[in-house]
């Protein structure tokens, strides 16, 4: 105790001295204690300090942050120091945080994940660093967030939520983040100079949860007009997000302008030529303004001017021409792409155009029309298919190794981590490699923390990662201490959900509990895997091991999240065993067997609802409360709630939902959804099958869209705080699974005896 004030004084003195000197000359991280010229520091470390105080409020004062000029080789950090006095040297505020993150994991043995943390296990005095830790990024671009992230992760969050996510991304070495929040603002402002009034434009702009697909030129105007106050509030939030990123030395990646315009644009603007874009899964796509025509440059200038005035300048802009079925019509694609890039260059000289590598985009014609040195393709398919040669396909255009381990914000556990660790460094080492970054692109974030942790680390490891060693180390820090049962649990998860193979899918299967009721259901979302992608026993074994973790570690936030998540996945996987048995009983006309199995299914869904209700990150209530909080009056609150409910269920109107296949695309096992939508759907369906067995008639048909749409338009409230004990409820799941397995064994033996 007696040494603490002295340590604190030393740290205060160190910070004061460092603020008056320059960081080391470019080329290397200076050795600790080396002299520096009496000039201004390389950058202001206070944003990193403030982030530390948010993330580690009672330990932040034990870190000294030293700014260092970034050498041509790129970002780097080093960590050294004695107990209670840890020095981190880095080339940006965000890189300083990455150094802190490396220290927390490698020295202090705790985790700040996305989500879940174990910092409560830190000792009062932080441990010293036995040997200096040094890391340099192997790639310049460390990009995060899918175009759809805001829609599927929550379009109605507040600044504190976004700031926390950015702080955590920085802690894991990310330096470029897509910021779509408030993207409607420059359209709303610029298009008023081209014949539209504000009210018209607010009818064209979609509500926040659906806005990502408007930016991708897939739809417009759904579900209701947005208000002036909402446009303004979102612009204010987006501006704060961009400022926070800049303060940390990170790059906000803003949506660029590539020609999306409202109906009737050509009629109001002589000389303009627009190309109808047809339909996107049932939605009318917005028109595309020909970038080679005389009006495009003027509109692009107005757009970028309004954007810069509100959001500030940046150096990276996201644009995807002809996304998912867009058509160029008579427009020459190469010329159009060149015009789009020239407009960007005029507004932001030297800016990088970020494109998504998805399906066949970007095509050779598009790339032939641009300066490829100022393009970055964030590849959404790096881990999905085999036989990829991006250098040949994209003609040497710089690209980022990317992954989409989650679609629609599904709560499924797992990822193709073995593909990541085998491919990334192999692609980087190719003689003609154009690999320039990583891109973490799940459609929804806030789950699968091990996947994010491992993927982000690829950019900071000098060579291939040994997955077995990595997961063992992850288990040792995740709950703030080494534990043999935690290690065994994560080894099972590595062997199971986190060993997905390439070839077809990049995400795990979704849940049958969330699927539209059918005896032949194999997935909930139309584009999800139709079968298990791993041995489900690995998850049950992992759950059994997690429940044996030492009591002291069970109090951590990370453990409580993980035990719910793993128990949820284990219970969910059982549905794929149970549903075929229900189908067999129904088709065989075995009423009592059918009823018994249906009772098991219903009991599992009831238990699932209670389980996920024990962790706030699996609650529907905050999602809906957040949406309503953005409304300026009761009517707007109701409209925004529908926006938030519909994206999770019907997604759109009847045609996009049913014919287009978007229904349940964003399914997730959240309390509220399970209890009030998914379970009642299955109960209603099974009741109809039961009546059909009793009466010998065909089951009554159901208009499931009407059922889902009624729920989406409802206004029932849901808990915003968890209830129940996560560990006890996970234990209930384990007991139920053990009992079910035992019952199947007994049933199998009885069947063999009868046959004998």
Q: What are the functions of these language-model segments?
A:
Residues 60, 111, 115-126, 147-149, ...:
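Catalytic-core regions of glycoside hydrolase
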Residues 39-139:
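Contiguous, structured surface segment used for ligand recognition
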Residues 529-554, 564-587:
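C-terminal substrate/ligand-recognition segments
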Residues 578, 583, 591-748:
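C-terminal amphipathic alpha-helical interaction region
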């Amino acid at each position: 105790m007696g040494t603490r004030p002295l340590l604190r004084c030393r740290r205060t003195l160190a910070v004061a001295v460092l603020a008056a000197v320059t960081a080391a000359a470019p080329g290397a991280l200076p050795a600790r204690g080396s002299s520096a010229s009496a000039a201004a520091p390389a950058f202001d470390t206070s944003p990193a300090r403030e982030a530390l105080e948010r993330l580690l409020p009672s330990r932040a004062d034990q870190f000294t942050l030293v700014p260092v000029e970034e050498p041509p080789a790129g970002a780097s950090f080093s960590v050294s120091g004695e107990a209670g006095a840890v020095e981190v040297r880095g080339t940006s505020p965000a890189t300083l945080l990455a150094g802190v993150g490396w220290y927390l994991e490698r020295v202090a043995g705790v985790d700040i994940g996305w989500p879940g943390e174990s910092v409560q296990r830190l000792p009062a005095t932080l441990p010293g660093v036995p040997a200096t830790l040094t890391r340099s990024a192997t790639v310049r671009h460390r990009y995060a967030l899918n175009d759809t992230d805001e829609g599927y992760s929550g379009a109605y969050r507040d600044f504190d939520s976004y700031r926390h996510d950015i702080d955590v991304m920085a802690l894991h070495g990310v330096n470029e983040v897509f910021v779509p929040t408030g993207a409607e603002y420059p359209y709303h402002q610029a298009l008023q100079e081209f014949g539209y009034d504000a009210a018209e434009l607010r009818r064209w702009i979609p509500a926040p949860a659906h806005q990502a697909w408007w930016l991708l030129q897939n739809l417009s105007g759904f579900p209701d007009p947005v208000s002036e106050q909402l446009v303004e509030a979102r612009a204010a939030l987006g501006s704060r997000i961009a400022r926070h990123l800049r303060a940390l030395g990170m790059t906000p990646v803003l949506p660029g302008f590539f020609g999306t315009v409202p109906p009737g644009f050509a009629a109001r603007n002589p000389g303009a030529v627009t190309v109808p874009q047809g339909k996107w899964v049932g939605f009318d796509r917005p028109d595309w303004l020909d970038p080679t025509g005389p009006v495009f440059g003027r509109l692009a200038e107005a757009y970028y001017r309004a954007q810069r005035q509100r959001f500030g300048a940046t150096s990276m802009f996201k644009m995807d021409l002809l996304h998912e079925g867009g058509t160029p019509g008579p427009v020459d694609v190469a010329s159009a792409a060149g015009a789009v890039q020239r407009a960007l260059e005029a507004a932001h000289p030297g800016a990088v155009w970020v494109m998504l590598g998805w399906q066949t985009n970007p095509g050779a014609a598009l790339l032939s029309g641009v300066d490829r040195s100022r393009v970055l393709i964030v590849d959404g398919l790096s881990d999905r298919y085999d036989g990829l040669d991006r250098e040949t396909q994209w003609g040497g255009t710089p690209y980022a190794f990317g992954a989409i381990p989650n679609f629609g914000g599904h709560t499924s556990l797992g990822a193709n981590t073995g593909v990541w660790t085998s491919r990334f460094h192999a692609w980087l080492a190719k003689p003609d490699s154009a690999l320039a970054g990583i891109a973490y692109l799940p459609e929804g974030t806030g789950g699968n923390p091990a996947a994010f942790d491992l993927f982000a680390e690829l950019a900071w490891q000098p060579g291939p990662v040994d997955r077995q060693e990595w997961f063992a180390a992850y288990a040792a820090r995740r709950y703030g201490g080494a534990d043999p049962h935690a290690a065994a649990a994560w080894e099972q998860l590595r062997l199971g959900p986190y060993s997905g193979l390439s070839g077809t899918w990049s995400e795990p299967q979704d849940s049958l509990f969330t699927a539209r009721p059918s005896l032949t259901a194999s997935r909930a979302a139309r584009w999800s895997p139709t079968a298990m992608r791993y041995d489900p026993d690995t998850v049950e074994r992992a759950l059994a091991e997690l429940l044996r973790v030492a009591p002291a570690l069970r109090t951590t936030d990370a453990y409580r999240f993980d035990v719910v998540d793993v128990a949820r996945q284990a219970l969910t996987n059982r549905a794929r065993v149970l549903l075929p048995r229900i189908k067999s009983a129904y088709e065989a006309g075995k009423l009592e067997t059918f009823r018994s199995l249906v009772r098991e299914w219903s009991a599992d869904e009831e238990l699932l609802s209670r389980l996920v209700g024990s962790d706030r990150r699996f609650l529907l209530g905050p999602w809906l409360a957040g949406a309503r909080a953005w409304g300026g009056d009761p009517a707007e609150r109701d409209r925004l709630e529908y926006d938030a409910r519909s994206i999770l269920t019907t997604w759109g109107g009847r045609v996009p939902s049913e014919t287009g296949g978007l229904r349940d695309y964003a399914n997730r096992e959240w309390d509220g959804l399970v209890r009030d939508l998914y379970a009642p759907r299955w109960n209603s369906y099974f009741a109809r099958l039961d009546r059909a067995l009793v009466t010998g008639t065909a089951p009554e048909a159901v208009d499931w869209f009407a059922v889902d749409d009624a729920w989406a338009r409802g206004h029932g409230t849901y808990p915003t705080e968890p209830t129940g004990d996560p560990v006890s409820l996970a234990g209930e799941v384990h007991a139920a699974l053990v009992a079910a397995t035992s019952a199947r064994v007994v049933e199998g033996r009885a069947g063999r005896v009868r046959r004998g």
